[in-house]
Amino acid sequence: MALLLAGCQMQPPEPPDEDKAAIDRMLVLIDERLDVAPLVAQSKWNSGEPIEAPEREAQILDQVAEDAEAAGVDDAFARRFFDKQFEASKQVQRRLHHQWLQEGRSPFADPPDLAEEVRPVLDRLTPQLIEALADMQRIAEVEGAGRYLEQRAAELIQDDFDGEPRDVAIAPLRERFAP
């Protein structure tokens, strides 16, 4: 009986169900955003465009900071979060380009059009991610939220590599969350 009671006392606290749902939603959105990276990689493979696009990223980050502030999200937190989303996506793109180079891959027969097919998906996800960041900001200090984030990230974010893009994408959340 004493062991049973001790075991019950050792259970780490979990966040409330509504906070778990908010964390899951954020992780699903991150996964959706990472799912776009192979499409970007295909388009850039065919066009020869560089993976790095610092001017475009800077423009997006400026707009994200403005939109985040309007949504009550700390603009520095939003900038860091989206900067890491860019980095995670570029990791996937670089790995795919390296793989295709090693395979001697010829251009794709029907690559996605960045402007017409890919950017609209990213444009749809960005405000949803900002909204989810507002939730993350609210629950960052909830006891057990960090543990829940870690547990669910591996289940909900499938980056098809070794988990490094996932780790990069959730780094700003890890830094902010209570264990």
Which residues fall in each region the model found?
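Second-shell loop/turn segments in exported
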Residues: 23-27, 45-54, 66-71, 111-120, ...
